[in-house]
């Protein structure tokens, strides 16, 4: 539907990259992405669509954890900065139209939620109930770790505009916990 000469669709949105770390099968694990798999997916779409169709380029959306936490290294301020810049350069140097999700340009990270009560996403609650309470296949502690890594709530926290109260997002208490790093990432 997207070949340039067909004049049907002008761009392809493909989500294969969003499952590179096993998210399509089971996002509630410690599984990390394979750099080899990541490069193969990106290359396949770049080569396959070259002079054939136009691609959309993105690392994040409202249903994905923050890309710098997912594909980068946030273990130190220096690693965080270099990872965020590397991901931005990678995205912008490919053929296609880059889409930047709110906060990605700042290098916003996943939120260190500590409790089930910190979450708002229904998928997260349902998965917790299924895996921890019904199946008893995952411990409470492991599930909290998986949720910190993969919950959609990571992408749904308020934009970190500045280092003022509530990151300058609102004078009122936000609907979900602010990432405590808003003091330095804004």
State each model region's role.
Residues 1-186:
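Active-site and adjacent substrate-binding regions of carbohydrate-active enzymes
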